[in-house]
Amino acid sequence: MITGSIVALATPMKASGEIDWEALRRLVGFHLDNGTDAIVAAGTTGEPTTMSFAEHFDVIRCVVEEVAGRIPVIAGTGANATSEAVELARYAREVGADLCLSVAPYYNKPTQEGLYQHFKAVAEGGGLPVILYNVPGRTCSDIYNETVFRLAELENIVGLKDATGNLERAEELVDRLKGSDFALYSGDDPTACDFMLMGGHGDISVCANVAPRAMHELCEAAVAGDDERAHQINTRLMPLHTALGVEANPIPVKWALHRMGLAEQGIRLPMTWLSDKYHSTVSEALQLAGVTEG
């Protein structure tokens, strides 16, 4: 089971919108040097929904090659067509990803039975261990806890990224799945500390893009049950957690990476560059977190 800080990796792009492969490799190295425990390639923060299939595949392959087995790579393989999600998972397996992260099908709003059958098909046909990804604020499709419990009984479904931010739901998940090998990850940085302290196994984090060492230390403390140290680190990071949500992800974090000199000013429509009025908010949060100097 993977534990700790799992970065939801942004995909660096040039001003033209072209993927910046050299910057992507450097960004992977930045995480290897700063304690990140695992990397999600081409998850939501990586903008796969505005990539071609070939680009999506190439991002996963590039990250796998650069990591070279040093930490686990989780491939973002979600799609709202089950056959496409299976195909993406198969490709991720072929290039050496360790697991896949499969988001609830978006826009078409399946029933709970439809969600169950979708993920069952991905688990059986994709050939990789599957982490479910529940983010109803983006997908309009909510994987209910009871459906998670059903899916957790399937052999190749190994975890859940819960990005609801609902700690009551998280508590039920932890209580029901305690003692199993099923991993529970937060996908909501502002509530991740409490999620882990109640028994979660890690955080699939946007903030880790820019504060990897601090997020590693936070997750390490929280997973170990060190309440005092975890809250101490989290208090310092909370302004950054908040600032990275002032506009839709990954808009603020891509601006932050540019501010840090780790990426060019590149993002793809329909996402746009961070509004001027939020530049100072994100910049000040980076300083408070100790990521940049004033």
Curated annotation (Swiss-Prot):
It catalyses: L-aspartate 4-semialdehyde + pyruvate = (2S,4S)-4-hydroxy-2,3,4,5-tetrahydrodipicolinate + H2O + H(+). Pathway: Amino-acid biosynthesis; L-lysine biosynthesis via DAP pathway; (S)-tetrahydrodipicolinate from L-aspartate: step 3/4. PROSITE patterns: DHDPS_2. The record marks 44, 107 as: Part of a proton relay during catalysis. CDD domains: DHDPS. It is found in: Cytoplasm. Its EC number is 4.3.3.7. GO terms for molecular function: 4-hydroxy-tetrahydrodipicolinate synthase activity. The active site is at residues 133, 161. Transmembrane segments: none annotated. It comes from the Bacteria. Pyruvate binds at residues 45, 204. GO terms for cellular component: cytosol. GO terms for biological process: diaminopimelate biosynthetic process; lysine biosynthetic process via diaminopimelate. Keywords: Amino-acid biosynthesis, Cytoplasm, Diaminopimelate biosynthesis, Lyase, Lysine biosynthesis, Schiff base. It holds the Pfam family DHDPS. Homotetramer; dimer of dimers. Catalyzes the condensation of (S)-aspartate-beta-semialdehyde [(S)-ASA] and pyruvate to 4-hydroxy-tetrahydrodipicolinate (HTPA). HAMAP family: DapA. Belongs to the DapA family. PANTHER family: 4-HYDROXY-2-OXOGLUTARATE ALDOLASE, MITOCHONDRIAL, DIHYDRODIPICOLINATE SYNTHASE. This is 4-hydroxy-tetrahydrodipicolinate synthase. It comes from Chromohalobacter salexigens (strain ATCC BAA-138 / DSM 3043 / CIP 106854 / NCIMB 13768 / 1H11).
